[in-house]
């Protein structure tokens, strides 16, 4: 788990990779082992990555969030700025800036929220970061 990310409540995040400024809701859980004990695969867009590993949890990009009791399957990938919530297991590949299961985040509201998130920790959202987030949003597939 990288800096300024937040996991304050119950839940399991075994063998996961959590980037910066991620907020994980209470009881967010992931599986980290397939039921058939096979190697874990995960998806990056259209690319299917064979890891040759038995244990991999969720990988979450910067500024992503999960709601209360969110469940991630083994080898789930969550892009930048996604706000994940809703019952049942989530999709294994969640694109950047996803809102819930089917919608996209409003970019202007997202940037304002990022400013609030960082200001709570005495940090500022710099113009270079805003430019990068806009680039990722524009090129999101």
Sequence positions of predicted segments:
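Glycine-rich hexapeptide-repeat left-handed beta-helix
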Residues: 1-141
């Amino acid at each position: 788990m990288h800096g300024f990310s937040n996991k304050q409540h119950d839940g399991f995040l075994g063998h996961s990779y959590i980037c910066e400024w991620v907020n994980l809701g209470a009881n967010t859980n992931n599986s980290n082992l397939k039921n058939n004990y096979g190697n874990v695969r995960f998806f990056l867009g259209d690319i299917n990555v064979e890891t040759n590993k038995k244990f991999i949890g969720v990988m979450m990009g910067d500024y992503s969030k999960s709601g209360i009791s969110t469940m991630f399957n083994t080898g789930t990938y969550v892009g930048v700025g996604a706000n994940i919530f809703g019952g049942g297991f989530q999709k294994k590949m969640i694109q950047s800036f996803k809102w819930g299961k089917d919608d996209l985040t409003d970019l202007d509201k997202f940037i304002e929220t990022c400013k609030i998130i960082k200001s709570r920790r005495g940090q500022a959202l710099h113009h270079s970061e805003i430019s990068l987030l806009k680039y990722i949003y524009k090129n999101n597939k």
